[in-house]
Regions:
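Interdomain "switch/hinge" adjacent to the Bergerat
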Residues: 1-25, 57-137, 162-307
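Conserved short strand/loop->alpha-helix "switch" segment adjacent to the catalytic nucleotide/phosphoryl-transfer site
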Residues: 22-49
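Short helix-loop "hinge" at the ATP-lid/N-box region of the Bergerat-fold HATPase_c
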Residues: 50, 54-58
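Glycine-rich phosphate-binding loop
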Residues: 132-152
């Protein structure tokens, strides 16, 4: 998502001593904590942000194959999956490899996560590869770290150009860390997995909360594959049935009848956002008339990071 930056001062005339604001090393953890805790709905934000990153990884791969954006020296198309391979969300009742119990796994088959990208992009708060165009959803540089708003530890497994990497991301006493656990070779094509262990004490409740977030956040996402989410989670997933759609509006009557969703809402790209009706004059519309989504392209609205 291309971010619009406001320029307040374009030029300083005269001999003026300028001091740039900095972040003290000892305060880095506090600042990062503040960024992570921006999200008003942590689980909903995790589902939205990590799934959007999965789609962005596929989009980046497809744009590079098409020649729309340049291939870098880290890219080797022979390791790319075909476009028919779609992002996945999986519920795992146990991950023996990592030694964790219930977990949600988000898997993409995009360009893969190289060691260089980990060092230069993934571990830097505010860094993003998505700010120069509106071809991808992200752009703030904090969405990949959104799992920290729910858990102190999560994992990433990456396959990139014939190599495998597994990482543990965790919150330390004074900073956040991403440690390389294992490195090996593989014949499998590129992919990235984000594994979020559930709180052991609240696992049953949080399974339901994650599935509710999937239903609320991702109902308009297309070509998304679910593995053991309904079966393992014990709750039905919503499937949008589009009754009407044009360039501005989308109507899905099944939301009203099956899920009691009646509000007018926003759709940015394919992400569903609630609309704050209190900001509008009374009587502007009957909010309980019909479940209608107002559509916007990525980059058309200025979204806040706390969304």
């Amino acid at each position: 998502m291309k971010l619009e930056r406001e320029h307040v001062v374009d030029e300083i005339i005269g001999d003026v001593k300028t001091n740039k604001f900095k972040i003290g090393e000892d305060s880095m953890g506090i600042i990062i904590d503040s960024l992570i805790n921006l999200y008003s709905d942590p689980i909903g934000s995790i589902v939205r942000e990590v799934t959007s990153n999965c789609y962005d990884a596929h989009r980046e791969k497809d744009l590079k194959v098409a020649g729309t954006i340049p291939i870098t020296d880290e890219d080797d198309p022979k390791w790319f999956h075909p476009t028919s391979k779609k992002p996945q969300i999986e519920f795992q009742e146990e991950n023996v490899l990592l030694g964790v119990g219930n977990a949600f796994l988000f898997r993409d088959f995009g360009v893969g996560l190289s060691k260089k990208r980990v060092e230069e992009i993934y571990t830097l708060f505010g860094n993003s590869t998505k700010r120069d165009d509106n071809n991808q959803i992200g752009g703030f540089g904090i969405g990949a770290k959104s799992p920290f708003s729910y858990t102190d530890t999560f994992y990433i497994m990456s396959k990139h150009n014939g190599k495998t990497f597994s990482y543990m991301l965790y919150r330390g006493n004074d900073a956040f860390h991403m440690d390389l656990l294992t490195e090996g070779v593989t014949t499998e094509l590129n992919s990235t997995e984000v594994i979020i262990p559930l709180d052991e004490k609240e696992s049953y409740r949080d399974i339901k909360r994650f599935i509710k977030a999937i239903n609320n956040q991702l109902m308009y996402f297309e070509d998304l594959q679910f593995i053991n989410v309904e079966e393992g989670g014990g709750r039905k997933l919503k499937k949008a049935t589009i009754d009407y759609e044009d360039q501005d509006l989308l109507i899905d009557l099944s939301q009203q009848h099956e899920y009691n969703v009646k509000e007018v809402h926003l759709i940015v790209g394919r992400v569903r956002y609630p609309l704050n009706h209190s900001m509008f004059e009374d009587g502007l519309w009957e909010r309980d008339e019909i479940p209608c989504g107002i559509k916007f392209d990525v980059g058309e609205l200025d979204l806040v990071p706390s969304r």
